[in-house]
A protein has these predicted regions:
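Compact soluble domain cores
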Residues: 1-65
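Functionally constrained cores in energy, signaling, and assembly domains
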Residues: 31, 72-73, 93
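Enriched for short, Lys/Arg-rich terminal
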Residues: 79-82, 86-101
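Basic/aromatic recognition patch in beta-strand/loop cores that engages polyanionic ligands
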Residues: 61-87
Length: 101
C-alpha cells in the first residue's frame, strides 16, 4: 500500500470507528500523562497527513508479509507523538501511539 492509500484508510477507519488499538502500557501511559481521551487520540490519528510519515511502507519484522507505516506529529504544543500503524484485514491496526522518545 502506498502512503496516500494508508492515509485514506486511516481517515476512513477513524471516521467509521473501525480500527484495532493495541493497548500497550506505553500507549496508555502517554495518554494519561497528557490527559488525552480516546476521542482525542482518534482525532489526532485522523489528522495524520503524508508529510507526517517518517518510515513506510516497510516490512514488519514479525510478520514479513505485512507493512508498517510510522508517523511523528505534534499532538499538543511541544509534544510529538510516535504512531505506528498497519493495514490488516481491511482494518487499521494502531500498534503504537505514544510520546516520541
Amino acid at each position: 500500500m502506498e502512503v496516500k492509500g494508508i492515509i485514506n484508510a486511516i481517515k476512513k477507519s477513524m471516521k467509521d470507528k473501525d480500527y484495532d488499538f493495541v493497548p500497550t502500557s506505553k500507549n496508555r501511559s502517554s495518554r494519561h500523562k497528557y490527559g488525552l481521551t480516546q476521542y482525542d487520540i482518534e482525532e489526532f490519528i485522523a489528522s495524520l497527513e503524508e508529510e507526517d510519515i517518517i518510515k513506510g511502507p516497510e516490512v514488519d519484522r514479525d510478520y514479513p508479509d505485512e507493512e508498517l507505516f510510522i508517523f511523528k506529529k505534534e499532538i499538543i504544543k511541544d509534544v510529538k507523538f510516535y504512531v505506528k500503524v498497519k493495514y490488516k484485514n481491511n482494518q487499521i491496526k494502531i500498534i503504537s501511539c505514544h510520546e516520541d522518545e
